[in-house]
Amino acid sequence: MEVIHGRPHCCRNLEGADILSNTFYSNGLHTPYETTIRPTASQARYQELREALPQCRLRWGADREYGGVLPVSLPEEHRPKCEPPRLMSKGHQHYGFGGEIWPKKLPIEQYYYMTQNKKSDVYGNDSLLPKPPNSAVKEICSPYPIEHPYHTHISRGSVFPTFTSPKDLYTGIKARTQQPFPPTVPTKACDTTILKTRGNPYRYELLDFPMDSKKKALTWPGQGVYYDFPKFVEKNKPVFYPKPPKTFAPNSSVNPWDTMSSAKDANIQRNLERSHWLTSYAHDFTGLGPMSPLELDDYHEKELAELTGQIGFDPQPQEKFHPALKTPRPLDGRIARLTQNQRPLEATVQIPPPCPDCTPRVLCAFHTFIPTSAEIMAMNNNLLSGITHKNQDVEEKIKEEQGLMSTCPLPTCYESKDLTSLYDVQSFPKITDTKKTDDLYWRQLEMKPLPISCSKSNHYIDYEPLKSAYRDPYAMCPNPVRLSKSNILQNKTDTADFTFDNFLSKPEFLGMNMESNEETRPLLDWIPRAGVPKHHSNLRNLRNTFSKSMAQKRLHNSIQEEQKDLRDKLQCGMRHQFFGYNGHHFYN
């Protein structure tokens, strides 16, 4: 850019920067969304623009000064004949910031609705400082919101939260409208009037106890916010508020901030609060296990109590159901069919033991010798001496017929059943009503185990001595192939004196195995095994001989060693060193 000569009032410097600033620098990296290319797209383009568009040089800040290029100010009597050229001058007035200190005209209209700023209501215009005549701000004689004086010492919420609702029947809005108040609604304290003359040493107080119909319900101040007044208002005394239990909505019944649909929901909330009063011990240990869920909705019962005139009907929440212990019932059998409302099975004649030679209608010669019920009754009523010999003959004949005709293997000892005890009519009382399942069940439990006699072989000796069945009638009888030697010898000595009476009164009993042994199955229906006593095991004697304390004593005696003395100087093994010294130095 060329310098224009002939202008002494202009400086010889060019305005502008030789380097393009990043503010005006634009390309695809800095302005990716710029659609049109500006003339200052690059450094080369900027230099080209400076050369193509020459600019006039400006004076030394003439346009930026508050003065300017002005004619020379001289008095009229001293002015020259020809007008001198204009010179740079600022004049004799100092304008400062170039404007008036206080505006003399009306304030400029500001449209604040177009922006988010708001105009101040205190000052007349939007200036930051008021005018000198209005600078004296007066006190506002109006209450202003404050916090409670003890706000830092009061919890915001309840320390022990409650479930009380504004629609509660006993502490809500309905209870506060009743006169007189119920005992569950607190009331305000009585008004106190203090009569004290200045200078008088005595203090007089007048207490006004209003009637119950004129009492007012207790309400804590500061439900919304606390207000304070200047000291010159209300006899120059500040307002002191009582300390509420909480700062956030202290009166739940005055301002129903929670939405409640009906009084039924309020009753449920109150019962829910009372359910939390139960201790964990009372909840877990009720005598019948843990407590069942509580019935919180008893609004219908309370409405009925109110209609019937019951006063103070407010029971504790009760359990929805109580656990009960039921006696176990068998899954199969006659009792199970009766409890399931099924048709009971018909009583059938007991089928004799299976035999290959027997048919469903004709029995083999072996099973035809089993005594009938008439013979059993005769034996029970008429105890004759000849029956004993007849019974021995029957047994011998049974053995012979079984060995000749039957193909079944003959056991070592044939088990003959004590049919007298099976058909004892007096032990089973008659029950006409078959639907009384409990009587049938307990009759089966009261049955004693059916004894079965056994005639022993004289050629077998057992090597395991067991208890005799004569002394323990409820013990299970040993297996017929494991009879004791003492019993055999005793039977040999009593063979001469053996009678049918002794045979019925002192039999050797066999255990009744209803699952595996078919010949010992009774001729009655199914009998539960709950009342059948079990045999005594020989392990009980071994268990009684064991003593835990003696075993521990023997263990300690076996591992007891001689106590070592730390004062002894050990030449071998582990040394007893303490802080570099042997232990015997500390005991000398």
From Swiss-Prot:
Keywords: Cell projection, Cilium, Cytoplasm, Cytoskeleton, Flagellum, Phosphoprotein
UniProt subcellular location: Cytoplasm, Cytoskeleton, Microtubule organizing center, Centrosome; Cytoplasm, Cytoskeleton, Flagellum axoneme
InterPro entries per record: SPMIP4 (IPR027886)
One Gene Ontology term, aspect cellular component: cytoplasm
Annotated transmembrane regions: none
Residue numbers carrying Phosphotyrosine: 441
Tissue spec: Predominantly expressed in the testes.
Observed effect of gene inactivation: The testis size, weight and histology, spermatogenesis, and sperm morphology and motility are normal in homozygous knockout males.
Annotated positions of the Phosphothreonine modification: 219
Protein name, entry field: Sperm-associated microtubule inner protein 4
